[in-house]
Regions:
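Short alpha-helical segments enriched in small residues
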Residues: 1-156
Length: 156
């Protein structure tokens, strides 16, 4: 799925940048393995620890305290902040709960991921649940994000 997504971006002369929390660079890694990586991958930033979200990406304490680091609201803000760091066409931010120890609740169990795709003047928000081992969850979220990028680019 990554290669299909990267090919679509390359065919449309679009670049992508990633801001990754729970995926910790996995999305950037997957794109770097594509034959089209040199044409599409601008780079990425891992903000696994909340201090990076605050100090590097300027996400406010208030937003994090109100919604938690793993939330739709913080993920959307990561897309906004990524536009100040990267000159890309597509911006992807992902937060979530890969394993226990984050902000999981009954309503937001481990396996919940939030991702946002910024394209042109729009931001598209997604909330998904992935099951399995951490590795299986990473593979699932990568596939889901690639499919969403394809849908966003094709339908915009």
């Amino acid at each position: 799925m990554t290669d299909s997504c990267a090919k679509l971006l390359a065919d449309n002369q679009l670049t992508v940048a990633f801001i990754e929390s729970a995926t910790a660079g996995y999305l950037s890694h997957c794109f770097s393995m594509s034959l089209y990586s040199g044409d599409v991958l601008m780079g990425g930033l891992v903000c696994y620890d909340v201090s990076i979200k605050k100090k590097v990406l300027n996400v406010s304490d208030q937003l994090i305290d109100e919604f938690t680091p793993e939330s739709a609201e913080v993920t959307r803000e990561l897309v906004h902040q990524s536009k100040l760091l990267f000159d890309a066409d597509v911006y992807v931010a992902c937060t979530g709960l890969l394993k226990p120890g984050g902000s999981e609740t009954e309503e937001k169990p481990v396996g919940t991921f939030f991702y946002c795709i910024g394209y042109k003047s729009e931001i598209y928000d997604f909330r998904v649940f992935c099951e399995g081992s951490p590795e299986q969850k990473l593979n699932s979220i990568n596939s889901l994000i690639c499919k969403s990028i394809i849908d966003v680019v094709n339908n915009h």
